[in-house]
Design a protein with these regions (language model features):
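Conserved metal-binding segment of the jelly-roll/cupin
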Residues: 42, 106-109, 113, 239-260
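Residues at the C-termini of beta-strands that transition into short coil/loop
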Residues: 67, 114, 124, 131, ...
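Contiguous mid-protein beta-loop-alpha structural module that forms a pocket-lining wall or clamp
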Residues: 103, 107-147
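Short beta-strand segments in beta-sandwich/barrel cores
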Residues: 61-63, 110, 222-227
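A conserved hydrophobic position in a structured secondary element of the catalytic/binding core
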Residues: 122, 248, 268
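Flexible, glycine/small-residue-enriched loop-and-beta-strand segment within the central core
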Residues: 2-98, 123-124, 130-136
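Proline-anchored loop/turn motifs at beta-strand termini and strand-loop-strand connectors
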Residues: 16, 52, 115, 249-250
Length: 298
């Protein structure tokens, strides 16, 4: 265990040997600091606070104390997920959970749960980005310079089987037209569709995966951003034209956010609605996806 001489660990606290505690960090009974965590200094870890493996708190981070430390109310507990990072001077309110890989900007005030790999800023904190390890910028550049049909109309995003599609767009004095064909350009025949609209700019949609259902997304009006994640790679793409669509195969975690005020997102689905087909918890998605990958490699 590595920690400053001014750090204090109370009896009943759990601190992994590989954790690093900075100046004037106090870990109270019932707090749990996981492997490879780092708390840089001037932070109190109250009873019930849990830092999961690899989490990092910058200097002067404030974790709101539970209303009654003796009550053991799990709803008051703060959980900082694996590899999550919290910037200097941020405030995390009681009961908040930061998902795996989430990033909290310096000085942010976080009063709501933060999804895995989301980047939040401001007071109150709002999602402004997602951590990516694959960039969609080259694909967007292709879309902006391509002239249909001189260049390919389907481009892989580098995230599993996710693909970006560009359709015919015809300009006419009577009104413009964009057209695509199912089972030819769109890789399945839909069983249903739905429209998403009137989404506040600070809200997210999606945040789930499907076990069997395939989806195809087109922002027919306005703009929105789509984050796709297959556990190995993660990428964000902006849908900003009615001739642009993105295909999500099964077992792809999908998020839609950054909706413009006039955005209308059309989603085609290969299956009828089935609540059992949804995976709404990212930790559950990780478990099932890893099992599926292991089965493929066996």
């Amino acid at each position: 265990m590595s920690h400053s001489d001014t750090a204090r660990i109370h009896a009943g606290a759990t601190v992994a040997p590989s954790a690093i505690l900075g100046d004037f960090v106090v870990v109270y009974p019932g707090a749990d600091v996981g492997a490879d965590c780092r708390v840089r200094g001037y932070t109190q870890l109250w009873p019930g606070v849990r830092l999961e493996a690899g989490a990092e708190l910058g200097p002067g981070v404030t974790l709101e104390a539970p209303e009654s430390p003796e009550s053991g109310n799990a709803g008051d507990s703060i959980v900082i997920g694996p590899q999550a990072r919290v910037g200097a001077g941020a405030l995390i309110c009681r009961g908040v959970r930061l998902g795996q890989g989430a990033v909290v900007a310096a000085g942010a005030v976080v009063a709501q749960n933060v999804p895995p790999y989301a980047v939040v800023t401001g007071s109150p904190a709002r999602i402004t980005d997602y951590v990516q390890n694959t960039s969609g910028a080259p694909v967007m550049a292709w879309h902006q310079r391509a002239t249909f049909p001189e260049q390919p109309s389907v481009v892989p995003l580098g995230v599993g089987g996710v693909t970006l599609h560009r359709f015919k767009f015809l300009q006419d004095p009577r009104g413009d037209l964009s057209v695509g064909e199912f089972s030819r350009e769109i890789p399945f025949t839909p069983s249903r569709y739905f429209l998403v609209m009137n989404v506040p700019s600070d809200k997210n949609r999606g945040e789930h995966a499907h076990r069997e259902c395939q989806q195809f997304l087109v922002c027919v009006k306005g703009t929105c951003s789509v984050v796709v994640d297959d556990l190995e790679q993660r990428c964000e793409i902006q849908l900003d034209s009615p001739d642009l669509g993105v295909y999500l195969p099964p077992m792809t975690w999908g998020i839609q956010y950054k909706y413009s005020s006039d955005a209308v997102l059309m989603v085609f689905a290969s299956h009828y609605y089935d609540a059992a087909d949804y995976i709404r918890d990212y930790d559950e998605f990780v478990i099932e996806k890893r099992a599926a990958l292991a089965k493929e490699q066996a």
